[in-house]
Swiss-Prot record:
Keywords: Cytoplasm, Phosphoprotein
Phylogenetic placement of the source organism: Bacteria, Pseudomonadati, Pseudomonadota, Gammaproteobacteria, Enterobacterales
Organism this protein belongs to: Klebsiella pneumoniae (strain 342)
Name of protein: Citrate lyase acyl carrier protein
Residue numbers carrying O-(phosphoribosyl dephospho-coenzyme A)serine: S14
A GO cellular component entry from the record: cytoplasm
Gene designation per UniProt: citD
Family per record: Belongs to the CitD family.
Length: 97
């Protein structure tokens, strides 16, 4: 899946996460994480983001995660929504999700 535009999903409210995804100039996933629980869960957040993007077939993107203590299911949903918006996909492939 190719990222065509910058897109975001989520809010900065407590127990939520804002995910921004856009096209990258370099190959790979460039990931920046800012989280109130980064010391405890930073590695888990990175793993969930990278797994979710891999499931969607994203190989090249700039990703910024601003986490306010979101649950894993919320993080996954926000990453999926932002990636689909950035790829400008209007038809969902439910089997990928």
């Amino acid at each position: 899946m190719e990222m065509k535009i910058d897109a975001l999903a989520g809010t900065l409210e407590s127990s939520d996460v804002m995910v921004r995804i856009g096209p990258a100039a370099q190959p790979g996933i460039q990931l920046e994480i800012d989280s109130i629980v980064k010391q405890q869960f930073g590695a888990a957040i990175e793993q969930v983001v990278r797994e979710t993007l891999a499931q969607l077939g994203v190989k090249q993107a700039n990703v910024v995660v601003d986490d306010k203590g979101a649950l894993e299911c919320v993080l996954r949903a926000r990453v999926q929504a932002a990636a689909l918006r950035a790829a400008q996909q209007s038809q969902l492939q439910w089997s990928q999700l």
